[in-house]
Curated annotation (Swiss-Prot):
InterPro entries referenced in this protein's UniProt entry, alphabetically: Rhodanese-like_dom, Rhodanese-like_dom_sf, TrhO, TRHO_N
EC number(s) stated in the UniProt entry for this protein: 1.14.-.-
Principal EC category: oxidoreductase
One Pfam family named in its UniProt record: Rhodanese
GO biological process annotation, one example: tRNA modification
Protein name (database record): tRNA uridine(34) hydroxylase
Disulfide bonds: none
Active site: 179 (cysteine persulfide intermediate)
Record lineage: Bacteria, Pseudomonadati, Pseudomonadota, Alphaproteobacteria, Hyphomicrobiales
Reactions the enzyme catalyzes: uridine(34) in tRNA + AH2 + O2 = 5-hydroxyuridine(34) in tRNA + A + H2O
GO molecular function, one term: oxidoreductase activity, acting on paired donors, with incorporation or reduction of molecular oxygen
Gene name of the record: trhO
Similarity-based family: Belongs to the TrhO family.
Keywords: Oxidoreductase, tRNA processing
Length: 304
């Protein structure tokens, strides 16, 4: 299958006092170049994932890196067979990745970056505690061998988990953390460093860079890596895995999941059926009908 869409996952922490002034120019450029996805702007920097033609993404990256505050953004590229986003959004936020703890600043203190080629040696060290900083539904479909799953629903819950498990953290000399693209670990390692832990490490470029650069036969990764777009998940080589999302709870679904009697497209799946009321499901049905209608209108407008 031909992959025509270039996907860029990017972030950069910076002292960006004028972030509000960047919203309109970024949105205008993306709309002019038919780029779709989401970019978040805050005083602490920029974060997001976007997709478009190769030339369009290059133009956007050139625009972003021309901003003096964004001289060295972390950018990971991959490809998609179809546009993985429905629209373009540039949002203003308090944080570019929400931890909810004031004063955590990766520009001041952060963990030691570990290149993918050196990651296996670190996490196989008996003195290393390996922590997956992602959400529970992400861990459920793939992670590194031996990683601790904090079982959090959102990244906001991570600081409380750390405080609750400090005794476990102190049992090991080293703490290694990882996430999808690296940004959550910028915050999590900065937070743990502020608590007084010194030997704190994180995977440079995140899981995506590891899966891109480490051959499957040498890998300590099992399963798939959840991504926050219509590809849903990727595997070694950043190949798409063919999953879909439950539109009610955003859990990743495979073919077997869709055979469940609790699965209804756009409405429910095994993971959320018992947590929703019938009123909720009826609301989701109406939302799904409206979504399908909007897709039909978009198709007709392109044909005219």
């Amino acid at each position: 299958m031909e992959k025509n869409f270039k996907v860029a996952a990017l972030y950069c922490f910076a002292d960006l006092k004028h972030y509000r002034q960047l919203q309109k120019p970024l949105l205008d450029l993306c709309q002019a170049k038919d780029i779709k996805g989401t970019l978040l702007l805050a005083q602490e920097g920029i974060n997001g994932t976007v997709a478009g033609s190769c030339a369009a993404i290059e133009t956007l990256v050139d625009f972003i890196t021309a901003e003096p505050a964004f001289q060295m953004p972390e950018i990971k590229y991959s490809w998609a067979s179809k546009m993985p986003f429905h629209r373009m959004k540039v949002r203003l936020k308090k944080e570019i990745v929400t931890m909810g703890v004031d004063g955590v600043n990766p520009l001041k203190a952060v963990g030691t970056y570990v290149d993918p080629k050196d990651w296996n040696a670190l996490i196989q060290d008996e003195e290393t505690l390996l922590i997956d900083t992602r959400n529970d539904y992400e861990y459920a479909i793939g992670s590194f061998q031996g990683a601790v799953d904090p079982r959090i629903k959102t990244f906001r819950e991570f600081p409380a988990w750390v405080l609750k498990h400090e005794a476990d953290l102190k049992k090991k000399k080293k703490i290694a953390m990882f996430c999808t693209g690296g940004i959550r670990c910028e915050k999590s390692t900065a937070y743990v460093r502020e608590l007084g832990y010194e030997q704190v490490y994180h995977l440079k470029g995140g899981i995506l860079k590891y899966l891109e650069t480490i051959p499957k036969e040498d890998s300590l990764w099992w399963g798939e890596c959840f991504v926050f777009d219509e590809r849903v998940s990727v595997k070694h080589g950043l190949e798409e895995c063919g999953r879909e999302l439950c539109r009610a709870c955003r859990s990743p679904l495979n073919t077997e999941s869709k055979l469940s009697p609790h699965y209804e497209e756009g409405v429910s799946c095994d993971a959320c059926y018992n947590t929703r009321s019938e009123d909720d499901r009826e609301r989701f049905r109406e939302r799904h009908r409206q979504f399908q209608l909007s897709k039909l209108r978009a198709m007709h407008s392109h044909q005219e």
